[in-house]
Regions:
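Hydrophobic transmembrane-helix bundles of small-molecule transporters
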Residues: 167-267
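Helix-loop-helix hairpins in multi-pass membrane proteins, especially solute transporters
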Residues: 70-208, 235
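Conserved extracellular-gate-facing transmembrane-helix segments in secondary transporters
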Residues: 26-40, 65, 224-228
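Membrane-interface helix caps of multi-pass secondary transporters
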Residues: 33-51, 76, 131
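The feature captures the transmembrane alpha-helix scaffold of multi-pass secondary transporters
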Residues: 17-24, 36, 40, 94, ...
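Cytosolic juxtamembrane N-terminal segment immediately preceding the first transmembrane helix
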Residues: 1-31, 46
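Conserved kink/hinge residues within transmembrane alpha-helices of Major Facilitator Superfamily
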Residues: 31, 38, 63, 67-74, ...
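Extracellular/periplasmic helix-loop-helix junction of adjacent transmembrane segments
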Residues: 40-70, 106-110
């Protein structure tokens, strides 16, 4: 059980930069995965003989799951601590990458992308929380800048790196490309990430609210991704949009009465 203070004494002034390198390595892996798949859509549709509407779920499933998993990140950090959460999400991310790379069909590939998205959604708040916890107050602006740089540059280079991989080898290897950053991040995380004693009792969490958000987000993302192809007046698109709107109203009503709301609307 070593928190940031104990680890800082152990590793000295370099500790904040060791933590920065750790979370940046994980951030680069996840940032690349968030955008590089866009250039693989034509290859995937040809490989599996599916339409664009199915292939788009590689991106839609990733983004939707990432959006929802962000909401559970603070609870996970509180329960597991930074180190275990970091190792867990990188493991999930690695499993998702491997599933996508060796997928025998589009469904397994999308499932792998959903795992990647879930890990990414927790990873972004975790990285910022960790850097804030180890940087002194007067240097937290620098921490924000470093994190912002990774958040912008990694997704920017994703399509470039992905395109080179597809042209040179195969679209399947595209999903292995983040792993050279992921594996060192896990190894460094085992040493440098702060840890804590596991809570004996789980803190309360609004799981019903989270399930509602999951349904709302997937319905909305599905409608938005299919609208340009099928037409915004298509029944499937209209039903999903109305469903997500109705779900949003129900979610707001629930949050106003929930004992431990996911979003405190009274603020």
């Amino acid at each position: 059980d070593m928190d940031g203070g104990a680890l800082s004494k152990r590793f000295g002034p370099l500790y904040v930069w060791l933590v920065t390198l750790t979370v940046m390595s994980g951030g680069i892996a996840m940032g690349l995965a968030s955008s590089m798949v866009n250039v693989a859509v034509p290859s995937v549709t040809g490989a599996f003989g599916v339409g664009l509407d199915q292939a788009q779920w590689m991106a839609t499933g990733f983004l939707a799951t990432m959006s929802v998993s962000m909401l559970v990140s603070s609870w996970l950090i509180e329960v597991l601590g930074q180190r275990i959460t970091f190792i867990a999400i990188l493991t999930i991310f690695g499993v998702g990458s491997f599933m996508s790379a060796v997928a025998p069909n589009i469904d397994i590939l999308i499932a792998g992308r959903i795992l990647q998205g879930a890990a990414n959604g927790v990873g972004q708040p975790l990285a910022m929380f960790t850097m804030f916890s180890v940087f002194p107050p007067e240097k937290r602006g620098m921490a924000i800048g470093i994190q912002g740089l990774v958040s912008v540059l990694a997704p920017t280079f994703g399509p470039i790196v992905g395109g080179i991989a597809i042209d040179s080898i195969s679209w399947r290897y595209l999903f292995f490309l983040p792993l050279p950053f992921c594996v060192p991040a896990m190894m460094m995380g085992l040493v440098f990430m702060p840890t804590k004693k596991l809570a004996r009792r789980l803190p309360p969490f609004d799981w019903i609210g989270l399930a509602m958000v999951l349904i709302i987000v997937f319905s909305a993302f599905s409608a938005i991704s299919n609208g340009p192809r099928t037409g915004w007046d298509a029944d499937s698109v209209v039903y999903r949009l109305w469903g997500s709107a109705a779900g949003l109203v129900i979610f707001i009503l629930w949050e106003l009465r929930a004992p431990y709301p996911l979003l405190d609307l009274s603020l």
